[in-house]
Amino acid sequence: MKVSTTALAVLLCTMTLCNQVFSAPYGADTPTACCFSYSRKIPRQFIVDYFETSSLCSQPGVIFLTKRNRQICADSKETWVQEYITDLELNA
């Protein structure tokens, strides 16, 4: 009986600690999307959205989302990338 009481106490303590770990605010340590290489220019009609990479990334970049839900990395300094971003912002 004493063993089962101890086991129950350990189980409850473990559950309490796990609950606190999993209740951390979303985004506290979430991974960031970074670009390690850039894609060539892709047709504008395939692009539906974009977001900029985090400032924590080693290379700045833009990630375009395609109609097929793929992510394409692009160099934010390139002219075509800036044109696509402007077009997406105007048509949002």
Swiss-Prot record:
GO terms under biological process: astrocyte cell migration; calcium ion transport; calcium-mediated signaling; cell activation; cell-cell signaling; chemotaxis; cytoskeleton organization; eosinophil chemotaxis
Xref: CDD domains: Chemokine_CC
Single GO MF annotation: chemoattractant activity
Secretion signal, residue range per the UniProt entry: 1-23
InterPro entries assigned: Chemokine_b/g/d, Chemokine_CC_CS, Chemokine_IL8-like_dom, Interleukin_8-like_sf
Family designation: Belongs to the intercrine beta (chemokine CC) family.
Protein name: C-C motif chemokine 3
Organism whose genome encodes this protein: Mus musculus
